[in-house]
Amino acid sequence: MEVCKGRMFVVDSDTINYVREENILYIKAPEPTNAEWLKTIADIMADMLQKEIGGYAFLWETKRNDQKSRIYGVYRIISKPFYECESDKQDYPFRIHVEKAYDFKNPIDEYEVLNNPYIKNSMWTMVGKKIAGKPRGTTPISMEEIKALIILLKDKNENFKFIPFDDKRIKNVEKPLQIDYKKTGENPKVKNLSDFHPNDLSYLWENSYYVRYEKILETIFNQEMSKRNEIFFKQIGVDVNKVIWFSNYLPYSIERSEMDYVIIQAEEKNIIDKIFLIEFQRGKVNINHIRRAYMYSRWINETLGYGTNITKPIIVCEKYIKFKKDKSVHKSDVLIDNVLVEYEKEEKQKLEIYTYDFSVTPLLLKKCR
């Protein structure tokens, strides 16, 4: 089985033992006490739904008094993500079953990875996470990062063992994580993580079916990509049969900002032929999102695309007002149209804008521009 996707899981001296003893990765969640607790749940769900059976997982152990930060590997994901509070680890309700893919006894130091002159340009998601310093329990890693980490771990472990994937070892879970698009009512008032299950919550507003938070669009796209929903993604030009990598919330260069979503397509799983950069937006398209979509797509072209114009910038939003010269429109819409016209003088890949409608089946992405 070809593996193109992996994630780094941040662990401490306690949680790393949970993984070793139980072959389960645990993600901590805060108690649902603040006004935006649903946003936090959707944020974690988005990351969890990016994980797929067969993908790799690395453990990034945080620094403590007597040791530096270290990276362990390599585990393989063997279940869909799920939510469970019926144990002594109720603070860690988001979970996924794993097994060893490579048995490496010795870890590698974080310093060896992030300061290696031969691979530093390839480690963009790890460097981005380190610089951002945000408390994220798990972060995606690129195909090049997976290869580099395994090579470095092999160098540290002469007598390592590789365990081939066998789908007979896949574990079925009773209630895998997913958003139910039919649930649009009020959410319950809860105090504890054990008071609810994420699958039973409402992530869309009742009358409009718009997402309650922008982050929920990341969750939905990961959910539909994990299903390889051909009808859904074909609407924006993505061929799910060619997709080799996808992820939400990716670091942009070494700045402390993030790209919402990236999808990579390839011919015969090897030669990248298209990259899709997707910015999500609640409400109506604005100038900042337009600028970011073009800025991020340029950066991807210069890095993953080897300087070519391979990246298609896309915005998915609630509303887009088409500019018509023969009708009076709001000044902001005129300004947005002017900005788009200026960008298109220089950009070979024109920005595409889609609105979404999750009240219908199949889910609708309507091209507006």
Model-derived features: positions:
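Short coil-to-beta transition motif at edge beta-strands of beta-rich domains
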Residues: 47-63
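Short, solvent-exposed secondary-structure capping/transition elements
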Residues: 66-70, 83-87, 271-272, 305-309
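TIR-domain catalytic/interaction hotspot
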Residues: 37-50
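Aromatic- and Lys/Arg-enriched surface recognition patch
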Residues: 68-72, 76-143
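Active-site catalytic microenvironments for nucleophilic, acid-base chemistry
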Residues: 60, 80, 299-303
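Catalytic micro-motifs at enzyme active sites that drive phosphoryl/nucleotidyl and oxygen chemistry
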Residues: 61-64, 82-88, 135, 249-251, ...
